[in-house]
């Protein structure tokens, strides 16, 4: 508002892979405010853009992969993992995803990750809740995700320095 007609949006490209068989994106997510604005633009509308920033892609190695995400960090990590398993069909690397949320109602796409776990024995999905509610009846990991990973995975890992870490959130 203080800038007049200038609207600043921080847009990240974190889409799931394209399904060539159906010709659609594997998303199923309705557009939000930023996407709605972008899709409302008409030819000739002026926009100012900057970026992209960062370098967040899957490295072509055989090393173990450890994904660590929390909150909105789910989106780019989910995209990575769907590409890794649904497109590349990765079976030769150990892949672990540790997701942190406050309570059970903030866990997204759990079914997607459990399906990957079922199909790919080299993938494990773990969840930790930092503030589980009584009605969650939570029996899983409790605490902030970084501490849970340290205490329940990295502390006894034979070579944590050899892992590729992918973090967002």
Language-model region placement:
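Histidine-anchored nucleotide/phosphate-binding helix
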Residues: 76-88
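Reductase modules of NAD(P)H-dependent flavoproteins
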Residues: 91-169
């Amino acid at each position: 508002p203080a800038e007049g007609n200038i609207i600043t949006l921080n847009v990240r490209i974190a889409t799931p892979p394209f399904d060539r068989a159906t010709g659609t994106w594997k998303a199923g997510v309705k557009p939000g405010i930023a996407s709605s604005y972008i899709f409302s633009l008409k030819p000739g509308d002026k926009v100012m853009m900057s970026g992209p920033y960062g370098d967040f892609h899957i490295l072509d190695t055989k090393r173990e992969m450890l994904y660590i995400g929390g909150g909105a960090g789910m989106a780019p990590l989910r995209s990575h993992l769907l590409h890794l398993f649904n497109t590349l069909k990765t079976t030769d690397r150990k892949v672990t995803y540790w997701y942190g949320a406050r309570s059970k109602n903030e866990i997204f796409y759990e079914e997607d990750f459990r399906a990957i776990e079922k199909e790919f024995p080299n993938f494990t999905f773990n969840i930790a809740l930092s503030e589980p509610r009584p009605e969650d009846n939570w029996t899983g990991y409790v605490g902030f995700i970084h501490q849970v990973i340290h205490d329940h995975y990295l502390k006894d890992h034979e070579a944590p320095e050899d892992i590729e870490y992918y973090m967002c959130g």
